[in-house]
Amino acid sequence: MNDKDYMRLALQLAKRGCGWTSPNPMVGAVVVKEGRTIGQGWHQRYGQAHAERNALASCTEDPQGATLYVTLEPCCHYGKQPPCVDAILDAGIHRVAVGSADPNPLVAGKGIAILRAHGIDVTENVLQEECDALNKVFFHYITTKRPFVSMKYAMTMDGKIATYTGASKWITGEIARNHVQRQRHRFRGIMVGVGTILADDPLLTCRIEGGRDPVRIICDTHLRTPLQSQVVMTAKQVPTILATCCGDPEKQAAYQQAGCRILCLEEHCGHVNLLQLMEQLGQEQIDSILLEGGGTLNWSALESGIVQQVQAYIAPKLFGGRDAKTPIEGAGVSFPDVAFQLKNSRLERLGEDLLIESEVEYPCLPESWKKSEQ
């Protein structure tokens, strides 16, 4: 086995922490001595030991003189855990192979520099593309302090998310729907508009056994969410946030008594200011959001510049219907050359359905975003 093979093993280990480590990154580590794998570890949960320490602790023999493969640059600062570079030095590791550099300002090359200063041979950028992709959520959050937002929708091949009657269960098959549940476990928050609550009364939880429910975020400008809706009735069991512009204390109190949190925000173009919402959620360590909104909220999110990724689940069906709903509504763009561009698309087959996952490429920051950063 070579460096890439061992790093692939470290990547597989890192993925075991999916859904549990946020707002920390997913990290895997492998200790190799004289061609033998003697230790493996991964960051299992936020606040617990990091991958490097777990790998070293699992070693079946003395790791002195061994090589450590780790998907992300070792940390060198005190947080909830002590610096991993200290553990590496104490163990007598001879060489470290790193997948991704850590953009966290508290690390950002310092971890590698410390190792080299102590005579450890460091190889950088082993399977960098794969290691970077693993932690795209963390990289976005640690550099912007705003959640990574993935717009998710299921549609027919003619671009409909419901029939003209509003019926939408089910567009995709069971395999695709199970994939969505894994996304709900993976993302820290799930966001919809009040229109989705009124139309579907969804529960918005993760239905995987042993999975983690995302924080539910409802964009509800005027507090129209029914008190008998599933999200309100279960708010004491699953964290639920109502993002609103309604400052009426009596209205707010009814939801608060049910267990909901109220975030009262500024109004922007008749709706909740999504940029302000992202800033507040980021401050609460919500590093990622699965946006399962309808066409109105999806357009507002794109227009605000908060969407980093689109996940389109496409079923081999045709609904037709001039009035059938589409994933993105709003005003739309005026000409094709000013469309929102998508890049780095990935295609995955899920039974008879397809998932297309793409990054959103904004040609420039929206004016409202620029103003918010001044």
What is each of the regions a protein language model found here?
Residues 2-8, 13-17, 22-24, 63, ...:
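Enzymes that bind and transform nitrogen-containing heteroaromatic metabolites
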Residues 59, 116-117, 142-144, 309, ...:
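Short alpha-helix boundary/capping motifs
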Residues 8, 12-15, 39, 50-53, ...:
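A broad detector of short, well-ordered amphipathic alpha-helices
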Residues 28:
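Helix-turn-helix
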Residues 31-130, 215, 241, 246-248, ...:
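Zn2+-dependent cytidine deaminase-like catalytic core
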Residues 51, 138-139, 301, 313:
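Aromatic-residue hotspot detector
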Residues 19-23, 112, 126-154:
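Proteins enriched for Cys/Gly/acidic motifs involved in redox and nucleic-acid/cofactor modification
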Residues 105-106, 132, 298, 320:
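Generic structural signal for helix capping and beta-alpha/helix-loop junctions
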